UniProtKB/Swiss-Prot annotation:
Residues 1-153 are annotated as: Disordered. Interacts (via N-terminus) with mago and tsu/Y14; the interaction is direct. Its main location: cytoplasm. Belongs to the pym family. Residues 62-97, 167-199 form a coiled coil. It comes from Anopheles gambiae. One of its GO terms (molecular function) is RNA binding. The gene is Pym. InterPro entries: PYM1, WIBG_mago-bd, WIBG_N_sf. This is Partner of Y14 and mago. Residues 65-90 have a biased composition (Basic and acidic residues). One of its GO terms (cellular component) is exon-exon junction complex.
Length: 233
């Protein structure tokens, strides 16, 4: 820690003696000067925030711990109540799914009437089952007949659709061939224009072969046009 002295001219550091016996001169100190060893160290905001107390002033950690324990007990109590409520709801749903007069117990379903059923009481139930089986068989036969007719109609529709699709594909193929051949005719006509010009370039072998095939290409175009017109009708 630096020792300062003050005189009429201001603050100064008095002369000090070195280890070898020599003396340092007194040094005048400017107003507001802070020595390097007295400059406070820099601390980031995160470090300053970490040094602050986590609890508000006047609040003890014991009170905070008790409040946490109380909240935890309340949460567990609510969880138990929710579990019990779900179990009761499931029991009610299971009881509502049983027929009238039947009670849901742990061992299974028990009828409300404990009297022994008479042998004649089973006959109406058997009669009802046989009538239900007959109606089910008749309905299955009707569905089978309807299914067979529906399958036949669907098969005929698919066959006709396949024929139409095949015809459309054939027409599309003919149209593509016509476009290619007409393009070749345009190229041949361009070559012929070059031949008619006196100062035009000489033609190579491939170009001459194209010109020779012009009649064959025109004939093929006529045949395809007839075929395309017949398919469109």
């Amino acid at each position: 820690m630096t020792t300062y002295s003050t005189d009429s001219q201001g603050k100064f550091i008095p002369a000090t003696q070195r280890p070898d016996g020599t003396w340092r001169k007194p040094r005048r100190v400017r107003d507001g000067y802070v020595p390097q060893e007295e400059v406070p160290l820099y601390e980031s905001k995160g470090k300053q925030f970490a040094q602050k107390p986590a609890l508000p002033p006047g609040l003890s950690p014991e009170v905070v711990q008790k409040a946490k324990e109380k909240r935890e007990r309340e949460r567990l109590r609510q969880a138990r109540e929710e579990q019990q409520r779900k179990e009761q709801q499931n029991k009610k749903q299971q009881a509502g799914a049983l027929p009238p007069g039947v009670l849901a117990v742990d061992g299974g379903a028990v009828g409300g009437n404990n009297d022994k059923q008479k042998p004649g009481a089973k006959q109406p139930q058997q009669h009802t089952k046989s009538s239900q089986q007959k109606s089910t068989t008749a309905a299955a036969a009707a569905v089978s007949n309807n299914s067979d007719s529906t399958v036949d109609e669907l098969a005929s529709a698919l066959a006709s659709g396949a024929q139409l699709a095949g015809a459309d594909a054939q027409q599309l193929e003919v149209a593509k061939k016509l476009r290619k051949l007409r393009k070749k005719i345009r190229e041949i006509e361009a070559i012929e224009t070059k031949l008619r010009s006196t100062d035009g370039p000489k033609l190579d072998k491939d170009q001459l072969e194209k010109v020779k095939r012009k009649p064959d290409i025109l004939q093929e175009i006529e045949e395809l046009e007839v075929q395309y017109s017949a398919g469109a009708m």
